[in-house]
Amino acid sequence: MKKVAIIGAGIVGATAAYYLSKESDLEVTVFDHGQGQATKAAAGIISPWFSKRRNKAWYKMARLGADFYVDLLADLEKSGQEIDFYQRSGVFLLKKDETKLEELYQLALQRREESPLIGQLGILDQASANELFPGLQGFDYLLYASGGARVDGQLLVTRLLEASQVKLVKEKVSLTPLSSGYQIGEEVFEQVILATGAWLGHLLEPLGYEVDVRPQKGQLRDYQLAQDMESYPVVMPEGEWDLIPFAGGKLSLGATHENDMGFDLTVDDTLLQQMEEAALTHYPTLAEAKSSGERVGIRAYTSDFSPFFGQVPGLRGVYAASGLGSSGLTTGPIIGYHLAQLVQDKKLTMDPLNYPIENYVKRVKSE
């Protein structure tokens, strides 16, 4: 049995654990500290098709990441897992300058040829939008795609770990290279996946690496409403907050994008209040909702906002990914799957050369 360790049980680590657990010749152990994980505090909208980012490699990963959910859902269903973390209920895109909607509509039509998952597309007026999301206002027109989905990140990770039945060790660990293998805690592993998001530098800097990954704080607030919102589309206005409705009257509002806060996990009521006030202009019903709690997580960004994955330069059998930013629930599962493929030396659909780890993880001194 080959021993494989995964450090970090967010969306990337949990997906890798799930796919590796299917291999009978591997013994997989997951280590997770459990503090500040971005996945648990993620708003969770899967709708990359309206992005105007010029980074073609990023868009390809995000597009394939949205498509990959279809495979992941099918695989989990075969494993006998509940698919209660994902719902394709559509997405509403709002723009302050509504003349831009036509251009985005045309872009999405063109992209639908390679991404049929986008589903039905249309520019809706307020009356039509209110048939799908009663009470939404503050716009004349919006763009709708029926294929937009929402994901409960924390629940997805729970389901992946349940299905994988791997050993989960809840502690903060470090990585020590030995002449053969790597020591983590009390054990030695032949291969290691580092899926610690913004904390990647904490593992690699002691080994003489420079890691171009910075933390960004995100906060969101959950509300409870009287009406069931299971079939409501997610709402993406211009700006940093989104409205994400769930079954059972749960509604999430978020998330903030706070730079220069390091790994701070305190709730900032002022920022959450500002977000709520901005959201009230679009959804006044929010004033009647009860706040049911806040979530805070730390996203990982590289200096050029690109994600990366691959083998850590100079550490044979150690693979890492980071820099997923605010699209981690879209790109996380497909990256986790690819890390699992790399461990097994299997075929990849995305070429790591387009997401080169050596641009972001550099050895500056040998131990």
Where are these regions (language model features)?
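N-terminal Rossmann-like FAD-binding beta1-loop-alpha1 element of flavoenzymes
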Residues: 2-28
